[in-house]
Amino acid sequence: MKQVPGYTLVRTEDCPEQHGTLTVLTHDVSGATILLVENEDNNKAFGIGFGTFPSDDTGVFHILEHSVLAGSEKYPVTSPFLQLLKSSMASFLNAMTFPDKTVYPFATPNETDFRNLMDVYLNAVFCPLAMVDRAVFEQEGWHRDADGTVSGVVYNEMQGALATPDAQLQNALERAMFPDTAYGFVSGGDPESIQALTYEKYQRVYRRHYSADNCCITLYGKMDMAEKLEMLDRDYLSRMPRTTTRPRLTVQDEQPGTCVELPYYTENPEPDEVQCALAWYTGAFADRERQLGVEILLDALLGTNNSPLKAALLAEKLGADIDMGFDDSTLQPTLELVLRGATEESARKFAPAVRKAVDDVLARGIPQELLLASLNSAEFASLERPGSLPDGVLDAINASTGWLHTGDPALLLHTDKLFASLRSKMADGWFDELLRSLFAPAPVQVLQVPTLPKKQEETQAPARTDAKLVLDHPLTVADLGEGAPSAAGQTEQVAGATVLRHPSAGSLYLNFYYDLGHVAPEDLPYLDLLTDVLDELDTPTHTAQQLNTLRSTWLGDSRVLLDFWTGRQEGAPCHAKLTMSLSLLERSLQKAVELGGEWLYDTQLTGPAAEAAFARVLSQQKLNMEQQFIQQGNAYAAVRASAHYNVENAASERCSGVSYYHFLCDLLEKADWAGLGAKLETLRAQVLQHAQLTVSLHGSEQALDTLRTLLPGSRFAAQERDAAQPYAEPLTPPVNEAFIIDGGVNYAVQVWPMERRSDRKVLARVMSYEYLWHNIREVGGAYGTGMLSSDGVEYLYTYRDPHLTESYDTFAKGPAELAARDYTEKDLNDLIVGAVAKLDTPRKPRAEARELDRQYFCGITEAMKAADRKALCAVDAARLKEQAAGLADAMAAGVKVTFGSRDAVEAAGSLFDRVETL
């Protein structure tokens, strides 16, 4: 690009990985580093990241992350971030505290929105009111009330975040590995230490770290870069001279052989719930080839239960599961292995068992086909960039990471040459030597033993008020446009299956949908279990490990799952599907059909190997669900409560909720693995041989031609299949339930049935952002709260909430308050813009493929989507007040479900008809 006044050009380079050009600049006055990623992506992104290095466990940088978004000089309102959530078209809007940096990114497809958001973010980080308003610190960080109780948004968030044994184990491991550097501290904050943070220290830390020469700014996508740089210089950077000393990270002397023991407090300590973590340093961050090699090596040796190293360790029967973790984003990357579900005696044998297993792998040599499969899989993922984060947000985070550790914000955006180099080294023993060097030092070790819990304190927080955010160029409903139509699909019959094709370029997405309308409700959990055990099972021609290797070699991603979808019309049926979802390059289509058929049809569900796999997988699933109840209790409560009101949620709860947890516990207690295998075999045959099959292809016309020739000779061909039918099951009467979990926080949910009306999404946004945010989050101290309206139900929820009864009382008062409010034209405009923007959020190709398939099965047409959009845009004050007035009766007919602490549940008394300890 052309030279822009005020900046020094460091370099410009082509970047095929980003489909565009990278430009690195330094701002002359402030010393800020800027990365421009210029390409044709309309989902434009911005990010500003600061190096933030904790020196204690007070969570000061986490509190600052929250605080700077709570009002600034140009936008002097309590929560501009909240008001942006209401009225922006952003596809991503957030901030993140990492162990060594804090990043403020957003993405939006709208140019006016981009300029507004960029100015709000820059004013927030460089001119926050929190530096002169102590109330912000107390609200977002911590405060003590007159009765001595402690609260605050971050304080309460971290009580929940650190409630799980995994979080406590991780923090202890990091302290043991990094006793002398920033990485040894809890960057999010430990509740026991947060109270030691003073307002004066908070101010000092901000001034030292939130300087322009300690930041990296990223601009990504299709935009006028020169215009954005001029705004940066004119309004912010030119006013910020360089500081004398920029904060720096220090390197930790490695700590091999360190051993730590710690308790984990739980309501029901069991001798077989011990965990043991082992960790090693993996080399220098700047050596990106080595770190990518570590990632590939670990996936090859530990990626599945049948991978050589993990299989050998599981065979020792030291515990129920072994997890692997690898973090290459820090100055000193690390890997860790965690043994779960062990006894104290077996946990102490873990380190020697790892040493022996590594030596055995080295003695035999690492199988080349495993390395190739893992390398191919990693390379496909780097091209596809799966997940929900917009590409520009990922680039902003990666730019901040590379800049922080090497001074080069573009370092992590180049990967093609790394993959090529590693591919050339596969046959020369490079990976064997890498494995040897990784595990040669004695590991850092942490042993975690369960014991009875400490008593938790009750907490609460004070009330605050708010004003309206005034933007230079606010969005209006007129800016929204008509919405882009989805690509039209075409169907045809091939080999007894319906083939649905949507045109797309790039990677192929191939989905096989088997109708489950004929399946009895009590059999659904078995099918869900089937989707989880397929990776563990042999076929007549391949071992499980061989088949996993082939799938990784030829496919980008492959998974089997259950889908439950319901249309938008009132009384619309539920469509239940057993789904195999594959992503691949077009040249691999034949292999995809062959491998997918073998994997789905030929895995052996009976015999000793299958029975051992069942016991292993069920134990692992049970452990994982117990962790998730503590971390995501609101999600489990919502699906549990919603199951009383529609079939889709009833099926989801049966296959992924508390009912499924009970199903797992029952199977583990019975341990009839032969009977389980026979049951799964019968169900699989019933579905795969007889259920209607729809094959969805998102790809080119040429790929469709190839698929037409492949299906008739494949396992998916059938002469005759049953007609599809809606899935149905009887709904159970509503019951108010509480589930007691470990930890000092609660998740309160209230659900009620409601007709499907798109315009109620505006009401949900008013409730979420005008009422609940203030009363539950700011006053009550919960980390999260909101209202959702979808799928024939509506619900209110809290997340990591110090309260329970008080939150339900707040829920009950909401309808009257919303009905009594006056809504200005600007209020309605902002709410409608935010609601409609959710319809236009850009999706990545895989997500777009799945959404188009959902629309096909549910009969969702362009006319329906246009009608939804029109209804949202037509909401007026009278309609909103009418909906709010009717909400109280609707809520009263609903149900309450809570996941929470014993103290809170017992204090709630008569709120619940049934209480269970999980």
Which role fits each region the language model picked out?
Residues M1-A45:
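Non-catalytic terminal extensions that flank enzyme cores
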Residues F92, Q203-R207, P263-T266, L309, ...:
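Generic recognition of flexible, low-complexity loop/linker segments
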Residues N43-F53, S79-C127, R134-E140, A167-E192, ...:
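M16 family metallopeptidases and their MPP-like homologs
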Residues R144-A212, T218-G221, M225-D233, M240-Y265, ...:
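Hydrophobic, small-residue-rich alpha-helical packing segments that form membrane-like cores
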Residues A427-K454:
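Extended, domain-scale alpha-helical bundle/helix-rich regions
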Residues E200-D235, S652, G657, L676-L711, ...:
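Non-catalytic, conformational "gating/processing" segments within enzyme and secreted inhibitor domains
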Residues V37-E40, G47-G49, Y155, Q159, ...:
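His/Glu-based metal-binding/catalytic segments typifying zinc-dependent metallopeptidases
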Residues T58-A70, L524, D528-D532:
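Active-site recognition of the HExxH zinc-binding catalytic motif
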